[in-house]
């Protein structure tokens, strides 16, 4: 008897297959846990893939020290609730040099506190495969990246040297020092993510739900004043608006959207009519043309 799977069931099955393939083929995998909605879905799928056992790999959070406070609280809450092995890495050199998004700009801050920090962590622990929650519908450089994305010993991605992935057969062979970035959510869309979160009742950071929040209008974006480190420019004022976030990152570099969607059902309804990418809320994507591909070539996820 043939069982017809729904769209979400097919995506779920593909992602679970990818998790198990990596666990079987690599010596020391890790899952990057950014605490956002995609990471929450990824974590849920990882738990399903190996149930009733726990995932056979740790979860790594690269802390830039500028994440939303609610993200950090949620991260610690989920680690305690689910009991997974959580590793937190901070680029202490960047902290010592006081690298921050206000004084050094988004490009330098992202490179030092995210890209370099990630490379440090992967080298420190010797991970040979790293799961991430990137999706092809997010951004053009991610659209052309393979599910199993090869990186050389310097963590560099070469888009002209990607491995074929015909018939869902993945090449897992690597030499010493090389690694693979793995994206089980490659074929998911933002709408798929939200419909799956609703279907599975997956916990997410409250910042995704609309609420009155103190924001500053800057460079066409609504920036949440999350703590006293937020430096106001001349003429700027903080005002409370009903906003939520479609994407999460470092709070000075992440724009909110005006919305009254305060339930999962309302968010799904909003996504059904959305005509813009969630990445429009990321200041780091505005650094320069092709900025995401440049960052990925340097080792960014």
Swiss-Prot record:
Region (Disordered): 279-301
Keyword annotations: ATP-binding, Nucleotide-binding, Nucleotidyltransferase, Transferase
Reaction equations catalysed: sulfate + ATP + H(+) = adenosine 5'-phosphosulfate + diphosphate
Alphabetical GO biological process terms: hydrogen sulfide biosynthetic process; sulfate assimilation
A GO term, aspect molecular function: ATP binding
CDD domains the record matches: Sulfate_adenylyltransferase_2 (cd23946)
Gene3D superfamilies: HUPs
Lineage top rank: taxon: Bacteria
E.C. no: 2.7.7.4
SUPFAM superfamilies noted in UniProt: Adenine nucleotide alpha hydrolases-like (SSF52402)
Pathway noted in the entry: Sulfur metabolism; hydrogen sulfide biosynthesis; sulfite from sulfate: step 1/3
Record text on subunit structure and interactions: Heterodimer composed of CysD, the smaller subunit, and CysN.
Family affiliation: Belongs to the PAPS reductase family. CysD subfamily.
Biological role: With CysN forms the ATP sulfurylase (ATPS) that catalyzes the adenylation of sulfate producing adenosine 5'-phosphosulfate (APS) and diphosphate, the first enzymatic step in sulfur assimilation pathway. APS synthesis involves the formation of a high-energy phosphoric-sulfuric acid anhydride bond driven by GTP hydrolysis by CysN coupled to ATP hydrolysis by CysD.
Identification of the protein by name: Sulfate adenylyltransferase subunit 2
Species of origin: Mesorhizobium japonicum (strain LMG 29417 / CECT 9101 / MAFF 303099) (Mesorhizobium loti (strain MAFF 303099))
